[in-house]
Structure formats: structure tokens, C-alpha cells
From Swiss-Prot:
Belongs to the universal ribosomal protein uL2 family. Residues 7-25 have a biased composition (Polar residues). InterPro entries: NA-bd_OB-fold, Rib_uL2_dom2, Ribosomal_uL2, Ribosomal_uL2_bac/org-type, Ribosomal_uL2_C, Ribosomal_uL2_dom3, Ribosomal_uL2_RNA-bd_dom, Translation_prot_SH3-like_sf. It is found in: Plastid, Chloroplast. The gene is rpl2-B. Part of the 50S ribosomal subunit. This is Large ribosomal subunit protein uL2cy. Residues 1-25, 223-274 are annotated as: Disordered. The keyword Nucleotide-binding does not apply. Keywords: Chloroplast, Plastid, Ribonucleoprotein, Ribosomal protein.
Amino acid sequence: MAIHLYKTSTPSTRNGTVDSQVKSNPRNNLIYGQRRCGKGRNARGIITARHRGGGHKRLYRKIDFRRNEKDIYGRIVTIEYDPNRNAYICLIHYGDGEKRYILHPRGAIIGDTIVSGTEVPIKMGNALPLTDMPLGTAIHNIEITLGKGGQLARAAGAVPKLIAKEGKSATLKLPSGEVRLISKNCSATVGQVGNVGVNQKSLGRAGSKRWLGKRPVVRGVVMNPVNHPHGGGEGRAPIGRKKPTTPWGYPALGRRSRKRNKYSDNLILRRRSK
């Protein structure tokens, strides 16, 4: 990925960066419009996820997470920007005439060939079951339920590793540090998700952040007591509590957000590192 750094010509472009190689020209039969409902609100219209709202209109790109074009070779035709995710996407032309989008594997270039199946080479971009992969393989777009399509490791730069296979299960180490079990029959794609340097980009101005649908962040300590538990006081007053809290009064640091008694609790061997 080539990141272009703007020269300091105006305050809005000072130190702003943009990817100078990836463009967006989606195919009409692989996109559709969608309403962006809620924007951080629940069904009652109450804010549950703060600092979201606005943003530019988006067209959703249909991504092939299942990779069910078995044993048919495809060629990477374009590498495109997708406004719905921080990873890039590739347009694939398959030998039978099918055209689909997939997540862009790191290092893949236009003209490379990919394939999915049970006995395919361990090559970047190929999709195959975990049982056919050697230990230590870097993978992404991992299925949790057989045939449902990839659900894990789809963000830019994500790269879990296959560290063990025993019985009917395979052990994966996820980017978060979590170690969990998954059925060996589930499929995954070889390689790392592209656009690794997405966290090194500088938007350069507030307007670019608003285009992404992200609203300003205000500290609770500078609010009024009616708006936040940290608010109020004379001058630069402390929060007035033993521990920081959310706007709704719950502990802000260290509180577990995972639901209790989930079916997958027995599949997680080690919780993610904070």
C-alpha cells in the first residue's frame, strides 16, 4: 500500500494521508443500496453507541465470504476500496464466468490466480479446510459454523495462526490473543488481510472523520452533571468517584461485556488479552 502524504498547503491538508493506488469502481451487479438505520441508536431511538451519526452514503459490496466456487481457478482483476470496511477487496473473474468480490490478501496483486477446495496448494488467497493446512499457517476469513462463511479475522491486517489440531477440532490463536477451538472441517483463507498500514493513516481534518460517520468525542468531566456522572464541579474538578464510569453509571474500566453462559465458552481456551 502506497500512502501519499499531502504537502502543507492549507490547514485542512496538513499531514493528511491518502492511499494513492486503490480506487473504487464497483460492478453494478455486485452492489446494492441500503438504509443506514439507527446510527448508534436502538429500536427506541435512544443512543446506545455514542459518537456515531452522519457520514457519506454508501453502496454495499457483496463479498464472497463462503468461497464456494470449488476447484475453479479465478484471477484477480482489480483491487478496490470498500467504504464498508477497512480492508480492501478484490474482484475475481472465475473460469466459469462467475465474478465475485473477496477480501484482499496481503501481497496479492492484479493477475494472481486463486482457488478454493479440499486439495489445493497452500498459497496466499486460496481457501481450504483447516484439516488440510499445516501447523503455523497464517489464515483469515475463518468459518465458525461449517458452510456459513467466514466470520473471524476479516479486518485489515488480521492474521490468526493455526497452532494445533487434535481430534475433530483445530486450535487457533486470534489477533486479540484469544485461543479457541474450531471444527477442523471449517474453511479459511491462507494469508493475512491486506491494508496493514490502515492505522498509520492521518485523516488531517475533522471533516474527513465526519465523512466516515464518526462524531466528536467530548470528555465527561467537562459536561454538566445531568449529562454525565463525571460532570459538574467548580473549575477543573475531579470526577468525584472512586472509579471512572460510563454515561449510564456502569464501570468504565475492566467490566466484562461478553454475555454469560454462551455456548462457545467451552471452546475458548484462553481469553483475549486486554
